[in-house]
């Protein structure tokens, strides 16, 4: 299928009908909603040789190169983006992390919830990188991660995460947070 054909496809979910938007349409709508985006590149192997150049050009054309972090499972793509446009915050998605992080030329690592250990946060910070966890959609896990030293939480439940964060800041003393963490850690076992 061509890009135009894909963008013309109708999609339906939960009684709603729409079409697959272009990247430009998606970014335009996100800007209107003041919704920050985390862009994930998912190369499939048949990209043009100038794929990274095209992406960087599009981010700059849309004026979001300093606003929207970008990540991928493909480390080489992210290192190319970092080299060509250091102003774009780049991340390496790691589905399962054991041991030490690879010394990668990116700004952050994104690890799956399953792989999270607090020493990974320390390790990332020592490498001058941030650590994000994904995909955290459960209220209990969101609450726990909001009280851990991670730099970012990737979630589909943005409004819920923002509400939980606001409530934690507003209503909790340090002792309350400690009790909450103890309660969460015993319920996770």
Go through each PLM region and give its residues.
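C-terminal active-site rim and adjoining tail of enzyme catalytic domains
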Residues: 15-20, 91-189
